Amino acid sequence: MLISSYNQVLVAFSLIVAILASYTALDMAGRVTLAKGREALSWLIGGAFAMGFGIWSMHFVGMLAFSLPIPLGYDLGLTLLSLLLAVGSSAFALWLVCQAELPWQRLALGALLMGSGIAAMHYTGMAALLMMPGIVYDPLWLGLSILIAVIASGAALWIAFRLRHGSRRIVLVRAGAALVMGCAIVGMHYTGMAAAQFPLGSFCGAAGRGIDNGWLAVLVIVITLAVIAIALIVSVLDSRLEARTSVLATSLARANRELIQLALHDNLTKLPNRMLLDDRLEQAIQQAIRDDRRFAVLFMDLDGFKAVNDAYGHHLGDLLLIEVAERIRANVRAQDTIARLGGDEFVLLIEAREPADAATLAEKLVKRISQPYQISRHEVRISASIGIALYPGDGQTRHELMINADAAMYHAKDQGRNGYCFFESSMNANAQEQLQLLHDLRQALERRQLVLHYQPKVLAPNGPMIGVEALLRWEHPQHGLITPGQFLPLAEKTGLIVQIGEWVLDEACRQMRLWLDGGHADWNIAVNLSALQFAHAGLVDSVRNALLRHSLEPSHLILEVTESTAMRDADASLVILEQLSAMGVGISIDDFGTGYSSLLYLKRLPASELKIDRGFINELAHDSDDAAIVSAIVALGRTLNLKIVAEGVETEAQQEFLTRLGCNSLQGFLLGRPMPAEQLLASVA
């Protein structure tokens, strides 16, 4: 037999080529797995060529390392056939590992086919020598080489399948796996070479007319380095592009989540908004139908929030809403839905097997929300009115439940606020009436349906008249003359009272100017300020503008503020009243005796008169307690140098008693009913 030898440098180079080819194959397997459609096919074809060229190159580098004492060459046709076998086996391997699953039966069949393909590539490449006589193969070494090829292929397929998805340490893991696979491929090659025996006298039929060793060396090295380098460079560039795409996708996903959050949640409190609440309500209805469940809708409105907002500004109002939302969250279960509809309206969707479940929660919320808030160094107090609608008794649809819960909430407000109320069918009619009345009220200002009537104020006991109180009336086209008690509460609920109050102030100043021009220089006019109007940030400017607009001296205008309104936030009230007083406007504390005034604050208030509440006047002749209270109020007013006005005087006995106590002026039906301006002038002519 001819004695063969190996170039150790080329043997080492063949191992390096095998490892690089293995790493390229593993990387390509990952690319094919991540890609889809035509992109996946492109990676599969490119990966098959890169891996096939790598294995083929390793084989022929190993052949270059092999030498015999005779000239050697390689048949071009068989050499190309061996290359095709290597590429085909690689394509099959990549396709196999990119499947969703790789059961052991498929793995075994794939290992057998791929191992056979690699072995066929090897022995076809050996056949390209065209040895005469033919190469003699040792059966044991031949079988061992094929077995190694099959086992190595199985290991390569399993490793590639396991590493097809990326991880943080994927480069190191693939490098280790490529080392194992490269050693296995090289082991198969050199085991196959060990099986080959060349008889003495043999010669290479391809020498001189095939590819000689020199050209083969150049061809193999150039092709090997070019293909593997191109494959790895493309893979690295794609990996970077993929990383950037992944970052972009992550950013887009985060932005999408934020957009969904903004679309479905209130930006201030982070609670679900109306859109998400509607969806939750629909789901609750479907689940209730399916599972025969019951649930409740609680419609909550904050009492006094607008006054806080106007008095302290929107920033503090926003902080208050956030705190209210936190208090609600702390008192409900995780599975319950809390939504903010806007402004100071909240809706709760809760599971309620019995009405008592909803009542218990409503009572707890009313108590919790009415507790004081410490916000930006201010102590703020509000309350909550809650309406409750139960499914299915109070509504079968989302719209019905919301409408009925809202109607129950307004009923709770009508009952005194700071409480809750279950929906009753009778509320619907009232709700419709209130809605229509509100619609008409919004148009009343535009259509000049609001008018002022004037009630005389006279010096005790019988006059003369020293002024009037302006009282609002609504001349409704269908319902006739409507008194303030019927529509002002609705105006306060909706905030329309501020706009109405500004109109009253302007109209009163206009009328007072006409009376002054008519020679009644000793008259003044009193205008009531609602709680919302008093707390409104533009009140002082509104008063100043009305006076300037009608060229009215401030001393002819008296602003009446109820005791409870003035004392709601005494420090803030003091600032407002001092600004009005500095302007020259008279200040009257209305309904005095019904609130909770501190004598210290009362002394500091720049008021010019106290107005005794009519509730104390009604029972003067029969109730000694009321008489004692009125006597005390008169004495207090004298001590503070305030004028005392008694309203609601309807009998001569009341007139005489109040005069005897020392009231400065009187007002009531006995002395004159509220009347239009023309009628008032006629009565004093």
From Swiss-Prot:
GO terms for molecular function: cyclic-guanylate-specific phosphodiesterase activity; diguanylate cyclase activity; metal ion binding. Disruption phenotype: Deletion of the gene in the mucoid alginate-overproducing strain PDO300 results in a nonmucoid phenotype and an about 38-fold decrease in alginate production. Inactivation of the gene impairs biofilm dispersion in response to NO and glutamate. Deletion results in increased swimming motility. Loss of the gene does not influence swarming motility. Its cofactor is Mg(2+). Keywords: c-di-GMP, Cell inner membrane, Cell membrane, Hydrolase, Magnesium, Membrane, Metal-binding, Transferase, Transmembrane, Transmembrane helix. The GGDEF and EAL domains are required for the alginate stimulating activity. It comes from Pseudomonas aeruginosa (strain ATCC 15692 / DSM 22644 / CIP 104116 / JCM 14847 / LMG 12228 / 1C / PRS 101 / PAO1). Residues 293-425 form the GGDEF domain. The lineage of its organism: Bacteria, Pseudomonadati, Pseudomonadota, Gammaproteobacteria, Pseudomonadales. Homodimer. One of its GO terms (cellular component) is plasma membrane. 3',3'-c-di-GMP binds at Q455, E469, L472, R473, N528, Q533, D590, R614, E650, F669. This is Bifunctional diguanylate cyclase/cyclic di-GMP phosphodiesterase MucR.
